[in-house]
Amino acid sequence: MKILLIGYGAMNQRVARLAEEKGHEIVGVIENTPKATTPYQQYQHIADVKDADVAIDFSNPNLLFPLLDEEFHLPLVVATTGEKEKLLNKLDELSQNIPVFFSANMSYGVHALTKILAAAVPLLDEFDIELTEAHHNKKVDAPSGTLEKLYDVIVSLKENVTPVYDRHELNEKRQPQDIGIHSIRGGTIVGEHEVLFAGTDETIQITHRAQSKDIFANGAIQAAERLVNKPNGFYTFDNL
């Protein structure tokens, strides 16, 4: 499989290493600014890339969105999470002409966590729910795209839910419809996501801990391996 990388930060550098270990070929990289240290052919426009089978994106909206406005002709795996609503609308439009895969978290374990959460919410309807995510001190966005995905699962199953980001500002007791959302930044934490169900005299915690960023890179490669054989459409872990 011949792969075009969109962005060449820490994540796509891992994708390149792991993909080549699997026997795939990196045919080029698209970056905002060409860098002498990038060890692959560099491009600025999708139309310039002639021999790729699939594109894998671990970049940011500033790089990705202008590319999506070009005539995108490759199956596309997207892991960018910024400006999510705008991104999903654009990917849905593109999926009429190419196969597109999107996930806010490329770990299959996190996908399993969303399924476990969907099963737990109806069973624990009277329990309070708090969501917490922790990441390294260089992560900019908060809360993480994965935590937003977990929140979306809850919203789809409970009515009149209210996200609470700063209880200090509220200065009032917790309301039944509140969903606490907490972000922690520190050190080199790869990624941790926890769902706390708090009931009377008992609590249940469901946690996913990423021990290496390789799980995200491998998830993107595995998605690409499947996507190249799919018809045009919008894909997630649910239907890939």
From Swiss-Prot:
Pfam families: DapB_C (PF05173), DapB_N (PF01113). GO terms for molecular function: 4-hydroxy-tetrahydrodipicolinate reductase; NAD binding; NADP binding; oxidoreductase activity, acting on CH or CH2 groups, NAD or NADP as acceptor. Its EC number is 1.17.1.8. Keywords: Amino-acid biosynthesis, Cytoplasm, Diaminopimelate biosynthesis, Lysine biosynthesis, NAD, NADP, Oxidoreductase. One of its GO terms (biological process) is lysine biosynthetic process via diaminopimelate. It catalyses: (S)-2,3,4,5-tetrahydrodipicolinate + NAD(+) + H2O = (2S,4S)-4-hydroxy-2,3,4,5-tetrahydrodipicolinate + NADH + H(+); (S)-2,3,4,5-tetrahydrodipicolinate + NADP(+) + H2O = (2S,4S)-4-hydroxy-2,3,4,5-tetrahydrodipicolinate + NADPH + H(+). (S)-2,3,4,5-tetrahydrodipicolinate binds at H136, G145, T146. GO terms for cellular component: cytosol. It is found in: Cytoplasm. Its main location: cytoplasm. NAD(+) binds at A79, T80, T81, S103, A104, N105, M106. Pathway: Amino-acid biosynthesis; L-lysine biosynthesis via DAP pathway; (S)-tetrahydrodipicolinate from L-aspartate: step 4/4. Gene3D superfamilies: Dihydrodipicolinate Reductase, domain 2, NAD(P)-binding Rossmann-like Domain. The keyword Mitochondrion does not apply. The active site is at H135 (proton donor/acceptor), K139 (proton donor). SUPFAM superfamilies: Glyceraldehyde-3-phosphate dehydrogenase-like, C-terminal domain, NAD(P)-binding Rossmann-fold domains. InterPro entries: DapB_C, DapB_N, DapB_N_CS, DHDPR_bac, NAD(P)-bd_dom_sf. NCBIfam families: dapB. HAMAP family: DapB. Catalyzes the conversion of 4-hydroxy-tetrahydrodipicolinate (HTPA) to tetrahydrodipicolinate. Belongs to the DapB family. This is 4-hydroxy-tetrahydrodipicolinate reductase. It comes from Staphylococcus aureus (strain MSSA476).
